[in-house]
Amino acid sequence: MGDTATMFCFQCEQTAGCTGCTGATGVCGKQASTAVLQDEVTGALVALARTVRAAGMNGDARRTADDLAMEGLFATLTNVDFDDAALADLLARVHAERDSVAASAQVGAAPDYDLAMLWNAPEDARSLKSLVLFGLRGLAAYAYHAAALGYRDDAVSSFLHEGLAALADDEADADVLLPLSLKVGEVNLRCMELLDRANTETFGTPEPTTVTRAVEAGPFIVVSGHDLHDLKLLLDQTEGRGVNVYTHGELLPAHAYPELKRYAHLKGNVGTAWQSQRVEFADLPAPVLFTTNCLMPPAASYADRVFTTGPVAYPGMMHVEAAPDGGKDFEPLIQRALELGGYAAATDTTGTFTTGFGHSAVLGVADTVVDAVKQGALSGYFLVGGCDGARPGRSYFRDFVQQAPDDSIILTLACGKFRFNDLDLGTIGGLPRIMDMGQCNDAYGAIRVAVALAEAFDCGVNDLPLTLVLSWYEQKAVSILLTLLHLGIRGIYLGPTLPAFVSPGVLDVLVREFDVRPITTPEEDLKAILA
């Protein structure tokens, strides 16, 4: 193991000084030892990928390596795995699989890649390799979710190994790395389509749904993260037990899926986006289950009520492991809910959220939209969404939505929606002016809508009355941005700050070739958009 006294990490939007976290602790709360282990896991995954490719492994023979690539890349996302013991175990499993592949194929086992080689590479090479690596982490998260529902794509799995192996090429320059970055976006589009199909074929097609923010009296559990499969398992095990279930954060869109909303004890949504959890959970008389990411170091006020599962882990927290068949026993979580008892009386929280405007729902009213635009009743669309975060500059997105023309519609997705989804902006032609399309991976749905509208108007996507205003925080946002660039979508407004890992040289390419635009103020940006 390397030097655990210091770290280097600049993969998230809140990285220290907009340059990188160094020293003993990162802004996200992970310790230097954790950051070092995450780098070691990544370096081991590069070695596994190189060994798998040398062995010419494909299909089912590569299944264990594929699963480790998904799990390992996911575990190194921001706000996922803070547990050194869990990461050390993962590292050992990656090494064991690499050695097994090498032995069975009679090829040499590739050595671990030292991430310091990447962090200390020439500026533009470091920037482009970081785009590839962080994009792969986001892509792997979506592949992990699809695989949990039994949906896999060999082309996606194969590319994870291809992309990882490419990181070890110290001679790769911009001519190699920029196309590779865009290929991450191409494969991520394919993976988001896979996950969309997995979700809709398993849980039904999302439909517009109103979700209460109030909590009923009695025992309950709050589920955070993104994992619909884990939520379904918990709903099955709590049915008839007198324990209600509430979503949090990115799981709000779960209420729109027919196979989930049929559970009478899936009651509503507690709280808002991930960065507010230390306040929102402080006095909660219920346990919280974290699925996938969005975990912050728990405050002492509620640490004894935190459960984790899947790739999420934190030292000292109860972790629910998956059985070999994929099942999970949530009985300890349920018992904790019964012990805590919930609220003695229903909360007086007012207001509702509306979700479920996925691509099927929006395309179902496409004729209305097209007619409204042609008749001048609708000036256009704004897609305002992405990751939320704690930086004060994120108030931009609420201000932007409030100042957008009254005859425009706001599409939104991911947890960035919580900046403004409490607003009542009225309707246009019977359509709500704010339409929540779902989780971050539902960017695929937004792309489908854009392509369909372009066909209806007989124009290119860039010619539509559609502007993308995106907030980013972690690596899934990177993979989505790369998908949009792969599709040739131009004029994307990005904020609240630019990624620290994007060098001036790479930024120049993004601005010149793709017209990526750092946000300024809502007033100035709207003036430019509407000119």
Give the location of each predicted region:
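Anaerobic metallocofactor- and corrinoid-dependent redox/one-carbon enzyme cores
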Residues: 2-34, 38-39, 46-47, 57, ...
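Electropositive, gly/pro-rich neighborhoods at or near active sites that engage anionic ligands
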Residues: 45-205
